[in-house]
Amino acid sequence: MQNKIGQNMKDTILEKSKELFLRNGFKTVGMDDIAQALHISKKTIYQYFPSKEDLVKATLYYVYNLAFSKIAEISGKCETAIHEHFKIKESIDGILGKDFETSPCFFQLKKYYPELCYEFEKKRCKDVKNHIENNISEGIKQGIYRENLDKSFLAVQFIAGSDAIDLYEAFPEEIGKRISIKEHDDKFLEFYLRSIVTPKGLEIVENLIKKENEI
């Protein structure tokens, strides 16, 4: 019983930390802010997370596990491998929330917790690469992706392209035209899929984009 109560409190702290960190950033939000939002003492938080870095790490992997449990839930259960991409994108957007669009959280993670960020990125890239390779295999079987695609190469390019919004900072003349994270993700997914689909797959991509635009 005591363990269950303790786990419930830990989960409550992680859920509130997720909300605040993703909205305002890992550096900006302090232990005081989380304690105040939960109406508990900092001492209670420190019982479960001995340091701010411990809480940042736990929250980061809490969000990651939420996202990948959704991916696992969706994978292989959609009408096609293309539908799977769109469904996962929608689900991840729901987990991150609308405030993520303007949040400095991952910029702050890289700047203030570089070792943690490096460790996290290694895991994320490995898991995403495996998922994309599996998706490509399924799409080829379904006749919607071209045969003889280099799955490993494409998976790495998918990860690089998904993260490429950070490169806007390298083009000062484009800063005023910087697109949102959602718009970047939408445009990149379309670009990626158009580069690998068959005519049958292209029809599915265009229909799904049309449906999204009608919402």
Language model feature labels by segment:
Residues 60-68:
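Short, basic, alpha-helical segments at the C-terminal edge of helix-turn-helix-like DNA-binding modules
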Residues 134-142, 175-215:
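C-terminal peripheral helix-coil segments that are non-catalytic and often amphipathic
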Residues 1-8, 210-215:
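N-terminal intrinsically disordered/low-complexity leader segments
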Residues 164-169:
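Membrane-embedded alpha-helical segments of multi-pass transporters/permeases
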Residues 97, 101-134, 141-144, 149-153:
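Short secondary-structure transition hinges
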Residues 105-113, 172-175, 207-211:
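Short linear capping/connector segments at secondary-structure termini
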